[in-house]
Amino acid sequence: RSSKRTVSGAVDRVKKEDMNKGVVTSPAEALKGKVAGVIISQAGGDPTSSPSIRVRGTSSLSGGNDPLIIIDGVFADMTMFNSLAPGDIESLTILKDASETAQYGSRGASGVIVVTTAKGKLGYSSLSYNGQFGVNTVYKNLDLMSASEYRETAKSLGLTYTDMGGDTNFLDEIERNVGLTQNHNISFSSGTDTSSLRASLGFVLRQGALKNSDMKNFTAKLDGTQYLFDKHLKLELGIFGSQRNSNIQYDMHKMFYSATAYNPTYPNVRNDKGEWDEDLLANEVWNPLGLLDIDDFYKDASVNVHGKATVNIIDGLTV
């Protein structure tokens, strides 16, 4: 369940046990549909795209509309937020009203998402693994002409066309039969009376509807807490790192358009020169198998280190 408290505005807090279950590969997917007024969307079929989040709608036509992200008290961005493993999140707190976001100034104009990650517990040790597997397929395709149907139609309409002697369904050639989705997370935590430690490793794989399109995200997280001087001093240290490797299609929309409009008499193999034949009679249409071969690899790595010291002077008074 999500809890709400009303002061001068509204605060929605979604705990770990209330987040979406199943094949969830990002914090945005875990949050989707859990808080009223928060809109989460993602481009379908593209595994490399990151979900967008709108907490207070579109507040700017020229500036950014992403909410301010705060992870364990440290300012972050949507890239780092989407890199977090869902299993490493303890809770998400969403601040929507201007009265609640005013403390963050203009940075909180589009709303604020406060992320609290999982930590080790005093006097408690555990080892856990969580994994999900899923598949995705193209639900429905256009019914394309075969090569013989294409020839007959072109002749009956008196159209000029190139006959390359093949019979290719280019949609079938560029699409995967089955795309895999995987999410793996393993964590270890240990605690004594005065200290705690938690370490985790995560891996996410998302394969798209198109061949040669996928995203792999590797994460590592380490958090430690130490109490000193009869617990009057609390020291916290956290390290989070991620690396995202993406194979991005050069132009997904052009590829689908070309696959549906390309001359099916063209073969699905290269010519003697090792090149893909192009239909010179086609307008704004390219051989989709040639487009599929264009490499567009993207790698993004980030590291976040944060620390905190809390002094408990007397009961109820901390600095």
Regions found by a protein language model. Give the residues of each.
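Generic low-complexity segments that are intrinsically disordered, proline-rich and/or Lys/Arg-biased
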Residues: 87, 265-268, 289
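Short, intrinsically disordered, charge-balanced linker/junction segments flanking boundaries
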Residues: 314-319
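Proline-rich low-complexity regions
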Residues: 51, 67-68, 261-265, 313
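Alpha-helical support elements that line or immediately flank enzyme active sites
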Residues: 305-311
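Extracellular/periplasm-exposed beta-strand and loop segments of Gram-negative cell-envelope proteins
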Residues: 142-144, 171-177, 250, 281-299
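A surface-exposed, glycine/aromatic-enriched loop/edge motif typical of exported proteins
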Residues: 142, 147-156, 241-280
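Short, small/polar-rich motifs associated with maturation and membrane association
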Residues: 1-222, 227-240, 304
